[in-house]
């Protein structure tokens, strides 16, 4: 019987070779290339900092891997601009449905030096994860929405969770049957302010993790709607190189009965 090769993952798993600050990761299998793709906010940690300008003006970085252990930086996504100038893209979320990739990304005009600017959710589609077509703004009834998580909760039934900063930074939900038109349901997780929700299934349960700036909050559910708080994770430094401080804004990839958590920290 052929034995599968165990891969020892490096720590850190990936470092952005331009700014060395990849954040808000999302990982998806590229069906066409048979490779793992990592998309992330290419935070400009080494740039001149005027207020919070270094958090803005970010592009979406791309890295690829055949085995999930060794990652190659491939650059940034092109063709996302919807207006002139240097603008801000945060926290990509990508889902594949009926042969089409859908990306939901947080967007801010320009490079603000403070937090007091509108934030929108933009929707793009692609056949190959490189060439993206703008499908429109996602109307969520708020001008300060970021950090999308999209999951198919039933056959052609999709749910979107996101951070609504106009509503106390609570995790809010919307539903859709086609990934283009969304109906807002309202706030869904209200025990604390948080961002970067991520939903997955494992061990017969529905799970949500979110970043509440003291580690990752963990919730479980039977129906993708009513969430029970569990013990936090990544709320202290790890033992591996550069694994310092709390874990932030994570993505989860489920393979069989195992889940792999991708997160970033501030070493």
Region locations from a protein language model:
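Carbohydrate-active catalytic/glycan-binding domains of CAZyme proteins
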Residues: 1-267
